[in-house]
């Protein structure tokens, strides 16, 4: 697929929900609320997506971030509470990281094929180019943005102000 398609998916064009629209108008109390049947709140999912986007973008920049021993490390601790200030910070970080990823998606074809150093044995089993890492990032975010859309529906907060299908 093209870098245009990658950018469109990062920014929620076409049939894909806009990740920022799914969180930007949600108040902190709803972002912090746990929905029955879901192990994490919306705020926790945004924290988790931020964690992995930051991790991948740092790898792309040539840093060697430590890979967590367990996925639980990519979620906030149980004692983490989300107030309005923390929620605003999480949303700003989310927007900034999405913007950084979208800027990278517009790199030259040669740059998109640049190999990224592995920081974990699992990376050696996957394609390790900038393009491949960005596609993994989009797919990961898509999964969690879908969860957020479902949770918002269950909380009676769908569609978001920025728009979203409501079949």
Language-model features and meaning:
Residues 2-10, 84-91:
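Active-site rim elements
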Residues 7-16, 20-23, 29-76, 118-167:
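Short, contiguous alpha-helical
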Residues 77-117, 131-139:
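Acidic/histidine-rich alpha-helical segments that form the ligand environment
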């Amino acid at each position: 697929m093209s870098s245009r398609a990658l950018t469109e998916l990062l920014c929620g064009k076409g049939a894909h929900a806009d990740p920022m629209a799914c969180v930007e108008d949600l108040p902190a109390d709803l972002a912090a609320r746990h929905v029955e049947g879901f192990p994490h709140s919306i705020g926790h999912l945004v924290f988790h997506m931020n964690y992995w986007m930051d991790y991948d973008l740092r790898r792309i920049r040539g840093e060697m971030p430590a890979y967590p021993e367990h996925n639980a490390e990519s979620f906030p601790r149980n004692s983490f509470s989300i107030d309005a200030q923390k929620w605003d910070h999480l949303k700003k970080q989310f927007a900034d990281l999405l913007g950084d990823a979208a800027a990278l998606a517009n790199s030259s074809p040669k740059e998109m094929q640049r190999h990224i150093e592995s920081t974990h044995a699992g990376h050696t089993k996957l394609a390790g180019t900038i393009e491949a890492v960005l596609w993994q990032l989009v797919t990961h975010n898509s999964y969690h943005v879908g969860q957020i859309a479902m949770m918002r529906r269950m909380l009676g907060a769908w569609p978001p102000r920025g728009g979203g299908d409501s079949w």
